[in-house]
Amino acid sequence: TGWIGGSDGTILKTSNTGSNWSPQTTNTTSPVYSLNFTNENTGWAVGYQGLIRYTTNGGTNWVNQTSPNSSWLYSVQFINSTTGYAAGTTGTILRTTNSGLNWLQQVTGIGDNMYGLHFPSPLTGYSVGTTGRIIKTTNGGLTIIEPIGNEVPADFSLKQNYPNPFNP
């Protein structure tokens, strides 16, 4: 099962690896930029001007959840059935710990648009944005670590490790 979002509130669902797509009723005309499902029934959609929609029946019905601001939301990821994150314009990172009943703004201290996020573990997460910006958290989004730099070294050198037992 898979879902895609698009303009005019479009959400499409496939149950046969993309051979056929069925439109879902979203009750919005706002663009949908990202979707994330924790199982085949429960998922979230985010998009234009703080759009957050939630389904518990595989996308048959979508209900509104309230965003704390009107930032455009470009990415959403839930790490379990209750804890999730959304990233958007002007450094917006939102966090919920109750399946989206309440979304709280996280302090990032940056103004760049954040276009993607990924949590490889419940506490460690990354978000990427404009100008190569990457930010990281190691405590589940409660605080953001100083943004990871985007500087590229001018040059580098690799020297022989002598004596090298693997390359006599």
Q: What is each of the regions a protein language model found here?
A:
Residues 1-145:
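Residue-level hotspots at or immediately adjacent to binding/recognition sites across diverse folds
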Residues 41, 123, 156, 160-162:
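Solvent-exposed, flexible loop/coil residues
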Residues 139-161:
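Residue-level detector of functionally pivotal "anchor" positions at catalytic/ligand-binding pockets or at interdomain
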Residues 163-168:
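Short, solvent-exposed loop/linker segments at the N-terminal edge
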